[in-house]
Amino acid sequence: MSHLPNLDSTLEHCTVCPHQCGANRHVGVGRCGVSAQPVVASVCLHRGEEPPISGAVGICNVFFAGCNLRCAFCQNHQISRCGTVQPHWLTTYSDIANSIETCLRQGATAVGFVSPSHQVAQMLRIVAELHRRGLHPRIVYNSNGFDSPQTLRLLEGVVDVYLPAFKYADNALAHACSGVEHYVETATAALAEMYRQKGASLVLNDNDEAEFGLIVRHLVLPGHIDNSIAALRLLAERISPRLHVSLMAQYYPPDGLSLGGDLARPLRENEYAAVLAEYNAMGLRGWAQELSSAQHYRPNFESESPFNT
């Protein structure tokens, strides 16, 4: 874990994610709303990921609080827009590692860090604590895609599987929905770095669990099928036509958020069918969710068991 001193120092004038907000997170919070302290909203066994990620038992997912994006439709908005640390959240490396260890005892062989882009330094210290305990699970980096290539380079040899999202092929849409500039160029550069490290192959073990590779996710947004088709084409043309792509249909307007226009409604069958047809025509490898998935993936992070409510 020789990377740790370098990443800890980046929090003094934060450059961990592409915003490079410059905050001293040792004395305050960054644009993400998080200080140098780890803030984990949930550690749980999760079976809802892609088959080679979940495996037969499930993956131990570590859900970081805060986020470097502000997506208007965020399904995890209860934790991504954290203002107050909730009593059941974890804020010490010992407590986080204890919870992960409990999951691993239940049979999980991989740990997925969800929304890690702004807590990479903390993530590495969690991994170091696991290694100190003699635990060496596979590490999955499950991000929104708005990652710093410089930070990702420090993760080479630490992360086994990258699982980023690629949300937009349209910067105007990215700004309107996620409040971010230059998403397309930034996310494409991050994906290029992940691809440099992993290539297009997905290496599976004897249990059909991903041990090494890259899977890119794309969530289809209602009323924005042109964005989805453009995103798939961009992935094939600028990264690789042999990428493993997970096409997601689980969009729903989250409770508690005020959304206007098409984002206020579910995805329609004809919209998803149009994107799925393009996906199949391009010959991309991967997985496509059923449209009904929107009825099942509705976590409640006010509960200590967010996926069991």
Predicted regions mapped to residue ranges:
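N-terminal [4Fe-4S]-dependent radical SAM core
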Residues: 1-68, 72-83, 302-304
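Auxiliary Fe-S-binding modules of radical SAM enzymes
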Residues: 1-29, 199-309
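Short Fe-S-cluster ligation motifs
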Residues: 41-61, 95-115, 284-286
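Short, compositionally biased "basic patch" segments
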Residues: 66-77, 90-102
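Short, conserved acidic/polar surface loops in the N-terminal third of protein domains
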Residues: 72-76, 83-87, 123-126, 151-152
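Short glycine-enriched, charge-decorated loop/helix-capping segments at active-site entrances
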Residues: 78-88, 176-181, 259-266
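Glycine-rich phosphate-binding "P-loop"
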Residues: 81-91, 110-115
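Conserved AdoMet/S-adenosylmethionine-binding subsite of the radical SAM
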Residues: 97-261
